[in-house]
Amino acid sequence: MKNYNNYIFESLYPGIEKISSQQFTEYLNNLKDFKLTDKGLFRGVELDKNPFYIVNYTNRTRIIGSVLSLIMEFHKSWSEYPKRSKSIIFTNSLKSAKSYADVDDIMKNPMENLYRVIPFDDSKFGLAPDSNYKLCFSKCNEDFIHYQKLFYELVSLCDSKYDLFINPTWTTIKNGGIKIIKSNYTKLMNNIDKSLDYGRSKNKKSKLLRFNNADELIEYYFNPTDNGFKILNYKDLINNLTIKHEIWTDSPCLLARYDEL
């Protein structure tokens, strides 16, 4: 029978399972891609400070449903990338990794909340060109300073009878986010089309009106290759870690507390 404390833990953190030191060693000894001498991948976590975990978000279905999340989850240009809704997100920077966990805990016990991410063999990774993926959409930055301002401009073109954004309330976020479902993405794309059509019909002025439809707009501003994102295997990932990066994978992996290695 499963230990009661482990059952409670897995209920609070679905997809993350505590493992023993012996189990961790067995997993580690069977890995072919990973070596302890490799450049480190790190994440700060707010768990219960167990030294070792296994992470598998394959069955996870809940995530905060922002507009950018919908695009990266469902647009065809991102189809080969790991699904962020089912991914663990981490970095190659110790300093940046600390921001993933509670600041007070990190200041009190910096090593107890900092974990090394150890991927299983044959994993694939999404690599952002900087430490915060939201700041990496260069064409948005050139035209709008930030991707959110692009969507604010779309809202300014809207017919007020419909809502362009499909974002959760703060209460929803605290309760675990909302399901990202394809119908939300379809609604988003349809509403972008409506915004462009409505703006043209009212002779509004906007650089967005040069696009014929939502797909063309998304492809121009959010194509991963054009914005410096990469999809890599583990060996190529390690060789591409030149600065601070945000990284994600939907493949299973191990977490080992930094002071245990």
Region spans (language model):
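A short acidic (Asp/Glu
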Residues: 52-55, 99-102, 127-129
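A structural signal for short, well-ordered beta-strand segments and their strand-loop junctions
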Residues: 41-43, 89-91, 116
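Cytochrome P450 catalytic domain signature, combining two hallmark sequence patches
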Residues: 104-117
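ADP-ribose/NAD+-binding catalytic cleft of ART/PARP-like enzymes
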Residues: 3-84, 243, 256-261
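Short acidic, S/G/P-rich loop/turn micro-motifs used as interaction or catalytic elements
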Residues: 48-50, 96-97, 124
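Extended catalytic/binding region for NAD+/ADP-ribose chemistry, centered on the ART fold
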Residues: 79-101
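Extracellular interaction modules
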Residues: 1-3, 110
